[in-house]
């Protein structure tokens, strides 16, 4: 199979309905094991709206962390205030330093918007990091590679990702199992560490312990330029 077959399909801005329903259930059952604190900007706990001109960048930052040593990831979910949150857009946060993460978005049309934050344990990123350390130390075993195949199976069963990702995951699992049948540890390892697989599992992997910031923050998109937008984060 060509590596192009593993490329995740271009995701739509909005979550798919099937994905949204599944994640809505996860929100309801979430243990909130990933903490989301110190969200900025937010005025009086969300009582007043942040103001931005259309097209003007809005940088959101937060402290995001969890217990243990697992890798985590997070995303800003945002959209028109009158739109079902399951249809909001999603933008991945970037790690800054310590527990601080941030992301920058903008709004194309004037009007009321809202945003919130979701975060989860990224078991694939955790596996990738730990497997590299073990391989570098000459201690990689079949157990780590069995775990890798299980991650791919769970991703395939999750229903996440854009159309076509499930087919790519099935082909990935087929390749991994062929390497395993030949006892080819290096083939499995190299495939799971490839950029194509990383992108695929970022798009379609399981979001373990999916947690959500309680509530959502209002944003008002002004038409044209807002010369005193910095003040709008301090005063209603």
What are these regions (language model features)?
Residues 2-35, 41, 53-82, 87-236:
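N-terminal structural segment of carbohydrate-active enzymes
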Residues 47-53:
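Short, solvent-exposed beta-strand/turn "edge" segments of beta-rich domains on protein surfaces
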């Amino acid at each position: 199979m060509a590596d192009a077959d593993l490329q995740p399909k271009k995701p739509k801005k909005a979550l798919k309905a099937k994905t949204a329903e599944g994640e809505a259930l996860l929100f309801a059952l979430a243990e909130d094991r990933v903490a989301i604190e110190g969200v900025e900007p937010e005025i009086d706990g969300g009582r007043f709206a942040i103001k931005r001109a259309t097209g003007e960048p809005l940088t959101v930052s937060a402290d995001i962390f969890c217990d243990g040593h697992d890798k985590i990831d997070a995303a800003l979910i945002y959209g028109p205030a009158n739109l079902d949150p399951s249809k909001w857009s999603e933008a991945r946060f970037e790690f800054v330093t310590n527990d601080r993460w941030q992301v920058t978005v903008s709004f194309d049309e004037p009007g009321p918007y809202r945003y919130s934050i979701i975060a989860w344990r990224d078991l694939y990123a955790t596996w990738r990091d730990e497997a590299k350390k073990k391989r570098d130390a000459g201690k990689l075993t079949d157990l780590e590679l069995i775990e890798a195949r299980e991650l791919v199976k769970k991703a395939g069963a999750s229903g996440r990702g854009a159309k076509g990702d499930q087919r790519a995951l099935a082909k990935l699992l087929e390749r991994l199992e062929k390497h395993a049948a030949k006892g080819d540890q290096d083939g499995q390892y190299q495939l799971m560490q490839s950029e194509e697989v990383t992108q695929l599992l970022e798009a379609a992997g399981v979001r373990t312990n999916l947690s959500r910031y309680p509530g959502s923050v209002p944003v008002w998109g002004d038409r044209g330029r807002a010369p005193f937008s910095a003040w709008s984060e301090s005063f209603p």
